């Protein structure tokens, strides 16, 4: 029997162990790569199924507990239980383990699909366009245009309602979400996709009873303000209650998001939601809620379903003033003096 030196024996054993481990690692890597590369296809199937989904025969209608004409907010126990439950559209916007997985999956899938190398090796014609809640119409048009290489005229065509379109307003009805389009999708076809989703998610659930109490245009406008002002789903209904309180009292809303809308509409500022300075409060515009009482003439952005529901079902709060601190905490008060005191506490100055 040949006696190998210990070092040679150890080396031989090491080689015997490394080879299968290396093969296993390569196989696992190939499988993992295949799974990841399948993300865009899986997302496309899911989105196409939703885009082709027929509207339910009797879709669940949005509840409404505010009455602008009577200037009342009457909270309903059953509605509160629904809105605060796990299946609520408001809770659907909260960051949970499940929602984080969904966001991560969508982000990875769209990032891969947008990569030129993926388009070349996959030989696919599909593209993804993601619209986030709180975007104004120009941002939505730019999102589609950057993916589909539209020119200025095509972008304008997309945001201009056709005679037979269901698009009810120039703002506020570009439903947030991820859309699956082909490289040949026209502005008219893209508008149809957006309109169909808005019909499915909002119009089909906005019953005549609800519309008789709060007209759709009014609800979308309030919801757009909530969407731009909220720090998350937890304060949506509180902000809604404060907005309605100020409307009931015929107070100016004094919402900075409307100043951002005015500022970006009339100046070249580099982004659609620029910071505001005190001088912006004097900008002449019907959208300036510091100068004019009541709601702006149209929504200022496209709200989520959660914000629309919050607009229809505000919290019955005595608060008139509110702000978010630097940590995202929400503070509301019934008097301006209390409001200023809290601002000094958290920001070192009043407002």
Predicted regions and their residues:
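Bacterial extracytoplasmic/cell-wall-associated proteins, especially those involved in peptidoglycan
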Residues: 32-44, 145-150, 163-351
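Signal peptide-directed extracytoplasmic domains
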Residues: 39-206
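N-terminal Lys/Arg-rich, disordered targeting/topogenic segments
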Residues: 1-18
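Sec-dependent N-terminal signal peptides
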Residues: 19-30
């Amino acid at each position: 029997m040949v006696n190998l030196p210990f070092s040679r024996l150890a080396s031989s054993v090491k080689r015997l162990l490394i080879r299968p481990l290396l093969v296993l690692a390569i196989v696992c890597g190939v499988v993992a790569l295949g799974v990841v590369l399948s993300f865009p296809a899986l997302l496309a199937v899911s989105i196409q199924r939703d885009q082709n989904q027929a509207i339910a025969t009797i879709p669940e209608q949005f509840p409404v507990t505010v009455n602008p004409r009577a200037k009342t907010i009457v909270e309903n126990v059953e509605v509160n239980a629904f809105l605060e439950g796990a299946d609520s559209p408001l809770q659907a916007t909260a960051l949970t383990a499940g929602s984080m997985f969904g966001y991560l999956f969508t982000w990875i899938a769209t990032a891969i699909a947008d990569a030129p190398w993926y388009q070349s090796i996959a030989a696919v014609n599909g593209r993804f366009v993601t619209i986030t809640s709180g975007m104004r119409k120009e941002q939505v048009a730019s999102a589609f245009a950057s993916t589909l290489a539209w020119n200025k005229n095509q972008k304008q065509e997309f945001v201009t309602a056709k005679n037979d379109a269901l698009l009810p307003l120039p703002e506020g009805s570009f439903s947030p979400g991820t859309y699956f389009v082909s490289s040949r999708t026209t502005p008219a076809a893209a508008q149809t996709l957006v309109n169909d989703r808005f019909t499915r998610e909002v119009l089909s659930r906005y019953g005549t009873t609800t519309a008789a109490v709060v007209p759709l245009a009014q609800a979308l406008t309030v919801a757009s303000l909530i969407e731009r002002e909220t720090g998350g789903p937890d304060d949506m209904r509180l902000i809604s209650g404060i907005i309605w309180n100020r409307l009931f009292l015929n107070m100016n809303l004094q919402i900075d998001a409307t100043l951002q809308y005015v500022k970006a509409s009339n100046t070249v500022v580099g982004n659609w939601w620029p910071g505001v300075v005190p001088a912006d409060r004097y900008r002449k515009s019907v959208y300036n809620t510091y100068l004019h009482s009541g709601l702006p003439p149209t929504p200022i952005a496209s709200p989520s379903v959660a914000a629309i529901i919050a607009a229809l079902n505000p919290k019955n709060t005595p608060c008139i003033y509110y702000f978010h601190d630097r940590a995202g905490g929400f503070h509301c008060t019934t008097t301006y003096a209390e409001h200023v005191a809290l601002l000094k506490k958290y920001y070192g100055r009043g407002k």
